[in-house]
Amino acid sequence: LIALDLSRLLSRVGRGTPTGIDRVELAYAEHLIASGSPAAFTAVAPGSRLALLPHPTAAQYVAAIGDTWRGTADPAGQDRLVRRLGRQARIAIFAGRERALLSQLRPAPTAPVPVYLLVSHHHLERRQIFARLKARCAARFICLIHDLIPIEFPEYAKPGQAANHLRRIETATQFADALIVNSAVTRDALQPHLDRAGRMPPVLVAPFGADLPPPPLGEGPPFDRPYFVYVSTIEARKNHLLLLNLWRRLAAELGERAPLLVLVGQRGWETENVIDLLDRCPALRDTVIERNSMPDAAMVALLQGARALLLPSFAEGFGFPLIEALQLGLPALCSDIAALRETGGTVAEFFDPLDGPGWRAAILDYAAAGSPRRAAQVSRLAGWKPPRWSEHFAAVDRFIAEVAAR
């Protein structure tokens, strides 16, 4: 039996465009439900205890929020459904007892050892939850680590987040029977913490998949000017400031001939200078378009008509938007950082995140009709094989079976 923790998904009701971690937890839940394997669903409840979710409630909630994010149902009706199912799930968690979960996680004499699986960082800093779980049942604890960015780059994190994330990593290195990571970059960042803990649990490197819906038929580009897209929460490490300053200059120099910049993502924290530019800079009003929420179907249509995806981030653990863009055949201009190099390989173009002139030259080149430079990347894309969720889960299923059999 696999008990998958859905705490993060339950916290995302009404939050708009899903983050990469949201997508991962959804993908795991959908895979587990579709597989028909023995499964349970759990979430953290008040008092730092884990409680069982009724299986039908969990399955209905997962289906509803998946349809919402993909844009495959009426938005207003779907939002009401997600909120109603979310309330039902939270009531069940609030009323549930940890004893019921623990009884599920006690192995039968001839069955494989059950697994408690946490694929977000949600409540991983609460060491006592996992200490109690390990003390009271024989279940294997497997968790997925997405990145160590708050520890490596505390200047880009909220105050206190570096210490909080360090507690998460310490919990994982102390209590996890096995670990899953999304990239070799994340594995290498995690290794010193494992060395310090003096434990060597098995670590699986399993890149995430990108299975976007097919592009809509017969729809042309949503804008009549060349445009570029940046898909990201607006926060300091994502380096929106580089693009906004560049676009302000392009607007002043080119006027209506300037390409458009479309920003897709929620506004984050400590980005006053970026928000001020978005809200108050006259030069950006006609050239920068902000979309806080966008379902997958609309995202595919937007990406399909773009000149390139832009990713000027200072730090990443994986880079979901990059594989999604490349999967659609859209060129990408990226920061020259290890995680994006690992994902983009020899296909994307890479620049120092502070190289304003380099970014500017590439953007103007890619914006031009018949750009040879853009065509060269499109040609390289022909030999690129996108990672698939099916491959990810084939590796993860084998890994979990091996850990449960130990």
Predicted regions and their residues:
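Carbohydrate transferase catalytic cores enriched for Leloir-type hexosyltransferases
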Residues: 1-406
